[in-house]
Curated annotation (Swiss-Prot):
Annotated positions binding ATP: 10-17
Protein task: Phosphorylation of dTMP to form dTDP in both de novo and salvage pathways of dTTP synthesis.
A family per Pfam: Thymidylate_kin
Protein name: Thymidylate kinase
Alphabetical list of NCBIfam families matching this protein: DTMP_kinase
MF terms (GO), sorted A to Z: ATP binding; dTMP kinase activity
Superkingdom assignment: Bacteria
Signal peptide: none
Kinase among keywords: yes
Entry keyword set: ATP-binding, Kinase, Nucleotide biosynthesis, Nucleotide-binding, Transferase
HAMAP family: Thymidylate_kinase (MF_00165)
Length: 203
């Protein structure tokens, strides 16, 4: 039986990464799951991690950025995601294609139609079974980022950029309610995990 594919999404500072290992551990405790693979984008493979460093720290044309994102994703799907799903394992990815539509599409203004062409070419019919969108107001995200490490290229973007990115995430969630669950990530970790527990019980 094919495994399930779960993605975590949200603007920088939303706090999604705090919960990935916890969700993975909850799923590993289930007897009906053959195994759980955690991964991330950009990255997830040796080549993908090299591209991640370029994407996070080098300035480039917005179309170049999108193409590199999808190049890393193609390798990620071929080497990690698809093989794991075929073996019946569940895959949890910290970001996937929704992030490209939100950041390069919403944030940078790249035409959705161009991204859809790349999406169809790179992943075909592959879509997450569940996308957890961790949503916070910009003020909350900014405060969390200010207290964190030195920002990368995306984390250092303007408030307007992050507002457009958040708006695109929420638009996509409204467009695909069967796949998305929007998490109010301003709440305590305990409250968020209570909600995640209920969501996981449905898949």
């Amino acid at each position: 039986m094919r495994g399930k594919f779960i993605t975590f999404e949200g603007i920088d500072g939303a706090g999604k990464s705090t919960h990935i290992d916890w969700v993975a551990d909850r799923l590993r405790a289930r007897a009906d799951i053959a195994g759980v693979v955690t991964t991330r984008e950009p990255g997830g493979t040796s080549l993908g991690e090299d591209l991640r460093q370029i994407l996070l720290h080098r300035k480039m044309h917005l179309e170049t950025e999108a193409l590199l994102m999808f190049a890393a994703r193609r390798e990620h799907i071929a080497e990690v995601i698809a093989p794991a799903l075929e073996r019946g394992k569940w895959v949890i990815s910290d970001r996937f294609t929704d992030a490209t539509f939100a950041y390069q599409g919403g944030g940078r203004g790249l035409a959705t139609e161009r991204l859809e062409v790349l999406e169809n070419w790179v992943q075909g019919s592959l879509q997450p079974d569940l996308t957890l969108l961790f949503d916070v107001p910009l003020e909350t995200a900014s405060a969390r980022l200010a207290a964190a490490r030195t920002p990368d290229k995306f984390e250092a973007e303007s408030r307007a950029f992050f507002q457009r990115t958040r708006d695109e995430y929420l638009r996509r969630a409204a467009q695909s309610p069967h796949r998305f669950r929007v998490i109010d990530a301003t709440r305590s970790i305990a409250d968020i995990r209570d909600e995640l527990e209920k969501i996981l019980a449905t898949i």
